[in-house]
C-alpha cells in the first residue's frame, strides 16, 4: 500500500510539473561590445484595377544589418551602430521589372535598384530600451547623402525610391524598428498569457494597428509567441506623394504571426507573418478635394525577420 501511495505521489508530482511553467520577463538585453545580425524580407503581391483593367504588381524587398552594441547605460538602454550588409529589391509588373540581390549579384546593379545597392556599407546609430522602444536615431543625414550620391538623376517618385524610404529616413528607420520590437510585454508572462498593444505605424501608408500576442510555450530557452493584428488606414493621415499625384488610402486587414524570442537576451530569433489588406486608393489633388480616381486594391504580404549573434550560412527563404 505504501508503494502504491508513492507511485500516486510521483504521478501527481509529474502532472503538476508538466502543467506549470515559470513566468518570464521578456526584455531586450543585448551585451555591450557584442555584434548581432538582422535580416528581413517582405514579399508583397498587389492586385489593383486601374481604368477598368486589372493589374498585378509584385514587390520583394529585403535588408540585412550588422548591429554593433556600442554601449548600454544604467537603465539597460542600448546604443547600436547598424550597418547595411545585404539588400534585395525585386519588382515585376506591367510597367517594369527589376531583380537585384546583393548576395547573388555583387557589383552588378540593374537599372532601378541603384538605391538599394547604395545602402551597402552605410548605416546609422539607434538607441533602444529594454522594452523595445526607439529612443533615438542618429546619422541619418549622412546615410541619405551617401545614398543620394550614388543615384542617377530622375529617380524621385519611382517605386525604388518609395520602397527605399523606410531604410534612409529617420521616420522610416524609427517606424520600422518600432514595428519590429513592439512585441515585448509590460509584465512577466507565462504560457497561455496574452497582452495587447495599439500603435500607429507609418511605413508606407499610415496604419492604425491593434495587436494581441499570446505566449504559446517556453521551450529550450526560447519563448514562442503567436500574434494576431487588425489594421486600418488612419483617416486623418495626409495624402502621400506618388510622383505627379497625391494618394489617400482606405485600407483594412489583418495579420497573423509566430515569433521566437531568446529568453536570455530578448533577441527576436525569428518572426514569420502573413498579412492581407484590401480597400481603395484615392487619387486626389489636395487633401480635402474629392477623388479624381479611385483604385480598388488587394495586398497580400509574407514577411520574415531573423536575428542572430552570428552570420547565416544560408539565404533567407
Provide a role label for each language-model segment.
Residues 23-317:
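Signature of exported/secreted
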Residues 7-18:
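Bacterial N-terminal signal peptides
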Residues 1-6:
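Positively charged n-region of N-terminal signal peptides that target proteins for export
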